[in-house]
Amino acid sequence: MKQHSLDILLRPRSIAFVGASDRPNSTGAAMLAMCLIDGFDGKIFSINPRLSTLNGRPCYADLRALPEVPDHVVIGVASRFVEVVVDQALELGIRAATIFASCYLDDDTSPRLPARIAAKASSAGMQICGANCMGFYTPSAGLRVASVASPDGLQKGGIAWIAQSGSAFGALSHNDRRLGFNLVVSTGMELVTTVADYMEWALHQPETRVVGLFIETIRNAAGFIAALEIARKREIPVVVLKVGRTLKSAQMAVSHTGAIAGNDAVYEAVFRAYGVHRVADMDEMAATLALFDTPRRPAPGQLGAIHDSGGERELLVDLAEDYGFRFAELASATCTALQEHLEPGLVAENPLDAFGTHNNLEDRFAALIATLVNDANVGLGVFLSNPRDGYAYAENYCSALIKAAQITDKPLALATNYSMADDRKIAIRLKEAGIPLLRGTRNALLATGHFMADREFRSRYSKLSEIAQPKNIVHEAVVSRWKARLADRAPLTEADGLTMLADFGLAAPGMATVTSLAELNAAINNLAFPTVLKTAEDYAHKSEVDGVRLNLTSADEAIEAYTEMAACLGPKVLVMEMVPAGFELSFGAIYDVDFGTVVIVSAGGVLIEFLNDKVAALAPLDCEAAKSLLSELRIARLLAGYRGKPAVDMDGLARQLAQFSQMVALLGDAITEIDINPVICGPDGAFAVDCLVLTKAGVK
């Protein structure tokens, strides 16, 4: 295989351990023991000026005393000694290092130690795992670089597990024998080598089937996007547990590793664009990785489930309904074939309760599983039970699954109804046969959902070579004019914002800004009643200051409303034609310096904060993507009409959203943030009736 720039870090031929020790339970002792536990056959050098030999090997005073220059130096000393070791390594031309220490010093100078090391190493082309990390494992090289002892028996497989949390790094690799890895990394502070770099290395390894990430932030956005693009093209799923969703946890991320968690909507948009599977916790992560680390992918169709319990079948059906999960409709021929293998009193259906008695259990279940899964409407099969090591029925079930796997090419999995079963031996046996074990009914359903969603993503984007780019929806002069206006420090009024929307092809009502009764009279002569009056003074939320008057049906009503509003809030007022009542949404966008412009759609009007129902996507969108985004709102079902209210014109609404996304993509960083709230939707279209714009200058 062609050499990769990270091979020197993750697959070195020789390693020096600075701080090696014979003291029990020390970092120096643990890192040597872990290096040997999986059979690493490269050269190992121990460095400790107080020892001449260690574990029967020579022990050297420092890096300069070594008989040859190693590929990689593992730095297992306290923070105050790290810089000296790094300087020696750079002097000798060592190109990779792992730093366990935090590199925080009480009496540090500016720039701080982490910044000094990062600058020196980057300049010299040195790769660094850490600082403040727990190391990494490369099972294919028989190598563990670690600061603490960990269990033996690490399973090899197709999972690359990359974690910014040291605890998360060990949670899966040290405790779960269902999972097999080809890379496990605790990235730490990422002084040089980032999550994106590890992803890129893993995606070029032939054994990688899935990449799992535990992240607080992304420090190399361009590299991350490039890695996601590689994953998309190679059809390697990426599963992410992104923490820092809430304000409190984002603040904790800063104190933990100095990571800025970032706007969660931006990450949600990036994940959506590249088909990244976002999970909520470690249990869902483990189940999803286990399912993706199989050689098979789901066929067209839905889930086929088989049980040895009627009651727990009902549990599955209840949970499936909670998550909107569908089971495959079986063909009549499949039901007939199933019935031949079922004992009296059992009904051929999906999900299938198949136990009856223990007679001929192994062969009967093998036939039932294969028959169910081979139905044309079934995409994958899951057998749910409560196996435990040493339980006779569990052995029968495992054998049945393995037999069934030999007569179907569709993926199979065993799921437990309880996540704490004693099933380590069963898990390993099934894994060797390419069948994952998923712990817990809920986790099994969630993982299966990701598995099937990945199929849909691949189907939709298999022919695309790149993420969508903005189109020239208006003349270039319009874009240039508005970029110039947005760069002006003069505040952009609501009327300016609505005019901008209209210039880019979005529907907005007729309007005029007035500062006197005379101007109001002139304006309403050119507008259709009913009208709306809104204060044009500097209030972000007009409804909170009684700055909106609706449904004014005559000139007299408009004059009366203007007089009252001008007296309380000031004479500058926006008069607009009133859009017929409809469903209220909000279109918004933010510009992120790392990932670009993100469109956010949510329930609108005064309910925007109350409902917290929003979805995000990278701009721009085409009409199909816009419609798909709208369908993911919790309130989407209401748009189809309810209780006598007419359905919204979804095609028209999607066109408006797509047009908006094209506009913000074309304007780029000229707009820091924009909020159109509400967008009033009905059977005759969608209209923007309020617009707030923030520019780079920080003025409205």
Model-derived regions, located:
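Catalytic-core regions of core metabolic enzymes
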Residues: M1-K700
